[in-house]
């Protein structure tokens, strides 16, 4: 052992130093690896942290937005609450204010004060600076505060008493203009009132109805008189002379009386001929009296518009349509007042050079013979009122009175004399030729006709219509037992048989055609065969005659005869002669014999 290798000790020391260096390196390597792992872990965790931060930032931003929106809503709510508080405060202040009074403005003065009428007194008050005194007009309402200061201008009064204007007084009012008028109020009480500003610019005539505040003493506006305004036919009737059948002679007479003086006024002046003042249309009911009056209004309106160069579509007729019973009033003098208003309105329109027609329908109801009244004597004052209007001291120029009546014998003779109702036109019941003309107005070739009837006339609608009219008229006017209607006994013992043709009228013919058309419609619905046929017209005649059997009752058959158009000897007895009326159904015919059953 002592002889070991030399240098062995130094080798061991070298190995030890090499081993420690190796351990340090290993430790350093491990440390570095740990550092690398830490760095790698941090590098891996860094995006996750960034995302977390971004998420927190987004949440914070969203919360800020929510808080901002909430803050905005709170601001709006506070602003609205503040506005409501201010409104409530204003409402409380307004409710706490004392009440305001109203007055009527009368006049203004240079010192800025004004006169008003309030609480039944005339007072001079001051005006608020916010009110322009120059804008206030006479009669205007003004609002006053508790100190009686004018704080606001208002409108004109719209309610009050209706008074009639008697006359306008030509003296200066507070504003230096015509401002006073004499009016008549309730119970003919007269008073002088101021005219408000709206009335100063409008023409006023005696008789106008004015709205009056009797306490303030002002008239504010003109009130339309419905009782007269409603009488004017602003819309022209659509009835022409061509639409009237069977009355060509009567139409010519009334055109000569009404239209000729207007169309050829120069010739009338040259021949010193005054146009007639009135026309009486009389005759049985349903024969066209009112129809002619409508045609006169239509024709006259077109003639006036043509003379003025206006479009006929804009034509207006000055046609005062007066229904007789409509004028009657239980108060004494009211009917006469209405008549005066009617003719006053007619004179106003006629003064413009336009012809005016005053049409009295059922004239016998109000202008009957004086002294003939049983329960009243209203005609003793109504008739003189009409007479004085037609040819009194105040003449009627360009005004024509047309009366219609089926009892002309009851009209006062003073009205019917020449110079008043000059022209008297009898509207008679249509004869056979007149009936054909009337049928032609209702049966036209554009109506659907039955195939059998068309075939009979070779398919010509015009010839078919003409044949149907011919057959119908022959059936109505033939003197057969089927057409016998009544046997009348006169006071002298004579008897006369009256046929249905003696009671025919234009209204009856129209009714027959309407019945036939309705039967044609029912036949179409039942049998599917369209068209109007002669058979429908024949059945319509039978039905119409059957209805005329049962006439209203009267105790005086002579009165019925006068209305129906039969004049002459007094009738004392009437008996029906209706036989064979509805042979198809075998209906029994009742023959009534009690006197006066038929009116």
Curated annotation (Swiss-Prot):
The keyword Transferase does not apply. PROSITE patterns: AAA. Residues 21-97 form a coiled coil. InterPro entries: AAA+_ATPase, AAA_ATPase_domain, ATPase_AAA_core, ATPase_AAA_CS, NA-bd_OB-fold, P-loop_NTPase, Prot_ATP_ID_OB_2nd, Prot_ATP_ID_OB_N. Gene3D superfamilies: 1.10.8.60, 1.20.5.170, Nucleic acid-binding proteins (2.40.50.140), P-loop containing nucleotide triphosphate hydrolases (3.40.50.300). SUPFAM superfamilies: P-loop containing nucleoside triphosphate hydrolases. GO terms for molecular function: ATP binding; ATP hydrolysis activity. GO terms for cellular component: proteasome complex. Keywords: ATP-binding, Chaperone, Coiled coil, Nucleotide-binding, Proteasome. Pfam families: AAA, Prot_ATP_ID_OB_C, Prot_ATP_ID_OB_N. The keyword Nucleotide-binding applies. GO terms for biological process: modification-dependent protein catabolic process; proteasomal protein catabolic process. SMART domains: AAA. Belongs to the AAA ATPase family. Consists of three main regions, an N-terminal coiled-coil domain that binds to protein Pup and functions as a docking station, an interdomain involved in ARC hexamerization, and a C-terminal ATPase domain of the AAA type. Homohexamer. Assembles into a hexameric ring structure that caps the 20S proteasome core. Strongly interacts with the prokaryotic ubiquitin-like protein Pup through a hydrophobic interface; the interacting region of ARC lies in its N-terminal coiled-coil domain. There is one Pup binding site per ARC hexamer ring. Upon ATP-binding, the C-terminus of ARC interacts with the alpha-rings of the proteasome core, possibly by binding to the intersubunit pockets. ATPase which is responsible for recognizing, binding, unfolding and translocation of pupylated proteins into the bacterial 20S proteasome core particle. May be essential for opening the gate of the 20S proteasome via an interaction with its C-terminus, thereby allowing substrate entry and access to the site of proteolysis. Thus, the C-termini of the proteasomal ATPase may function like a 'key in a lock' to induce gate opening and therefore regulate proteolysis. This is Proteasome-associated ATPase. It comes from Actinosynnema mirum (strain ATCC 29888 / DSM 43827 / JCM 3225 / NBRC 14064 / NCIMB 13271 / NRRL B-12336 / IMRU 3971 / 101). The lineage of its organism: Bacteria, Bacillati, Actinomycetota, Actinomycetes, Pseudonocardiales.
């Amino acid at each position: 052992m002592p002889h070991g290798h030399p240098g062995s000790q130094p080798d061991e020391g070298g190995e030890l130093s090499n081993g420690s260096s190796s351990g340090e390196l290993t430790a350093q390597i491990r440390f570095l690896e740990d550092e690398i792992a830490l760095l790698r872990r941090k590098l891996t965790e860094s995006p996750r942290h960034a995302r977390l931060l971004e998420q927190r930032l987004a949440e914070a931003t969203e919360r800020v937005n929510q808080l901002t929106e909430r803050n905005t809503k709170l601001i709006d709510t506070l602003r609205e609450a503040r506005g409501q508080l201010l409104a409530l405060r204003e409402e409380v202040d307004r409710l706490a204010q004392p009440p305001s009074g109203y007055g009527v403005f009368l006049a203004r003065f240079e010192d800025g004060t004004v006169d008003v009428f309030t609480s039944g007194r005339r007072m001079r008050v001051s005006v608020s600076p916010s009110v322009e005194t120059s804008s206030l007009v006479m009669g205007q309402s003004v609002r006053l505060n508790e100190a009686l200061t004018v704080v606001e201008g208002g409108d004109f009064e719209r309610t009050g008493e209706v008074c009639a204007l008697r006359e306008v007084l030509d003296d200066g009012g507070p504003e230096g203009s015509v401002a006073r008028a004499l009016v008549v109020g309730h119970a003919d009480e007269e008073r002088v009132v101021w005219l408000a500003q709206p009335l100063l610019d409008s023409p006023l005539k005696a008789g106008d109805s004015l709205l009056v505040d009797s306490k303030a003493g002002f008239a504010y506006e003109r009130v339309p008189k419905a009782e007269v305004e409603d009488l004017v036919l602003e819309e022209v009737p659509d009835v022409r002379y061509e639409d009237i059948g069977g009355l060509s002679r009567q139409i010519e007479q009334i055109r000569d009386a009404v239209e000729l003086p207007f169309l050829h006024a120069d010739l009338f002046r040259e021949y010193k001929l005054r146009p007639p003042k009135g026309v009486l249309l009389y005759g049985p009911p349903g024969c066209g009296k009112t129809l002619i009056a409508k045609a006169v209004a239509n024709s006259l309106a077109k003639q006036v518009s043509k003379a003025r160069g206006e479009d006929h579509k804009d034509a207006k007729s000055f046609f005062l349509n007066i229904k007789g019973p409509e004028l009657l009033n239980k108060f004494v003098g009211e009917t006469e007042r209405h008549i005066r208003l009617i003719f006053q309105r007619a004179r106003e329109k006629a003064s413009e050079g336009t012809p005016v027609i005053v049409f009295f329908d059922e004239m016998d109801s109000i202008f009957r013979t004086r002294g003939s009244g049983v329960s009243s004597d209203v005609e003793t004052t109504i008739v003189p009122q009409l007479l004085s209007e037609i040819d009194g001291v105040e003449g009627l120029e360009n005004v024509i009175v047309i009366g219609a009546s089926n009892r002309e014998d009851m009209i006062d003779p003073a009205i019917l004399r020449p110079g008043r109702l000059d022209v008297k036109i009898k509207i008679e019941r249509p004869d056979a030729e007149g009936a054909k003309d009337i049928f032609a107005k209702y049966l036209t070739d554009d109506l659907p006709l039955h195939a059998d009837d068309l075939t009979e006339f070779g398919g010509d609608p015009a010839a078919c219509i003409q044949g149907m009219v011919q057959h119908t008229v022959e059936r109505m006017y033939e003197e057969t037992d089927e057409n016998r209607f009544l046997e009348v006994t006169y006071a002298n013992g004579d008897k006369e048989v009256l046929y249905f043709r003696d009671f025919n009228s234009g209204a009856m013919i129209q009714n027959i055609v309407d019945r036939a058309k309705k039967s044609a419609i029912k036949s179409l619905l039942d049998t599917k065969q369209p068209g109007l046929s002669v058979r429908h017209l024949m059945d319509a005649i039978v039905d119409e005659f059957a209805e005329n059997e049962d006439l209203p009752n009267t105790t005086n058959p002579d009165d019925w005869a006068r209305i129906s158009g039969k004049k002459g000897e007094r009738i004392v007895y009437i008996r029906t002669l209706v036989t064979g009326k509805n042979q198809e159904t075998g209906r029994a015919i009742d023959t009534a014999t009690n006197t006066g059953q038929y009116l």
